[in-house]
């Protein structure tokens, strides 16, 4: 039985032996949070809001936080990771778990949900389903910054040049306690930005869980395209738009974001 406390993680072993750290708090039905790029479990400002009536499990994806890594990284390995954690959480709870994934984590979650029956409801916040990787010159700039130890610069390149994040939002993120953890994940960026993140139609059609897609009304067009792709592929899917928000609405307006999630999960 998992001990649900915020003081330390428990671990799940993935298919290739990678150990994945999971941080749990709260009581009630299970909810798994899967973060995106430039993040670990500490990026979630909504944990306390969601844990009012749920056991919230926030995993560290491989290569960051309390999780280990492996040399042969592919998105497929990370999908296997999420499936492993979903099944561990569901086994501990004795019931299927709800799942919330953001960005790259959302991409992993929609693929994982097509492979396991242990997802009750699925929330995807701007899942990063992209047919083309970032331009080689941009990836090279990020890699050069990482190689030189300029991790903060690498993260800021991504936020400014890929997400088109307003300077006010970037300044807000810099002031948060999770900023050092974001910066520490910079070495994982080149690999994630060098590959397409494709959604197989058959895999998406296998998602049986009711699914909520959340998008920011002001988010970049490539994320809007991703929303349309997923909405047209997952059978039981609805879309909610957060007007005036972009890719970090859970940071800029956590109360509203959490309320949208909680309302859907009550269904």
State each model region's role.
Residues 60-65, 128, 243-245:
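Short beta-to-alpha linker loops that shape the active-site pocket of alpha/beta-hydrolase fold enzymes
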Residues 5-68:
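Conserved HGGG/HGGXW glycine-rich cap/lid loop of the alpha/beta-hydrolase fold
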Residues 95-133:
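Conserved hydrolase catalytic core segment
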Residues 33-37, 103, 216:
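Glycine-rich His-Gly loop
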Residues 57-100, 259:
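Active-site loop/oxyanion-hole signature of alpha/beta-hydrolase fold enzymes
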Residues 135, 151-190:
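Conserved alpha/beta-hydrolase catalytic His-Asp/Glu region
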Residues 181-233, 238-241:
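Conserved serine/cysteine hydrolase catalytic core
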């Amino acid at each position: 039985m998992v001990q649900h406390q915020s003081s330390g993680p428990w671990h799940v072993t993935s298919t290739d032996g990678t150990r994945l750290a999971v941080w749990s708090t709260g009581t009630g039905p299970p909810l798994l949070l899967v973060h995106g790029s430039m993040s670990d479990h500490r990026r979630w400002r909504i944990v306390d809001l969601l844990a009012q009536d749920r056991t919230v499990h926030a995993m560290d994806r491989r290569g960051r936080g309390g999780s280990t890594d492996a040399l042969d990284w592919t998105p497929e390995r990370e999908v296997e990771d999420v499936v492993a954690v979903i099944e561990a959480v569901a086994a501990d709870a004795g019931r299927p778990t709800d799942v919330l994934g953001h960005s790259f984590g959302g991409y992993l979650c929609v693929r994982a949900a097509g492979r396991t029956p242990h997802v009750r409801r699925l929330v995807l916040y701007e899942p990063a389903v992209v047919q083309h990787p970032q331009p080689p010159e941009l990836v090279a700039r990020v890699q050069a910054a990482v190689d030189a130890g300029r991790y903060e610069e690498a993260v800021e390149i991504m936020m400014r040049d890929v997400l088109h994040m307003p300077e006010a939002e970037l300044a807000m993120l810099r002031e948060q306690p999770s900023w050092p953890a974001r910066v520490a994940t910079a070495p994982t960026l080149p690999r994630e930005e060098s590959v397409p993140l494709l959604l197989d139609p058959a895999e998406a059609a296998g998602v049986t869980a009711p699914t909520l897609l959340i998008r920011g009304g002001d988010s970049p067009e490539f994320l809007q395209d991703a929303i349309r792709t997923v909405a047209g592929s997952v059978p039981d899917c609805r879309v909610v738009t957060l007007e005036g928000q972009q890719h970090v609405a859970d940071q800029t307006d956590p109360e509203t974001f959490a309320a949208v999630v909680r309302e859907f999960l009550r269904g």
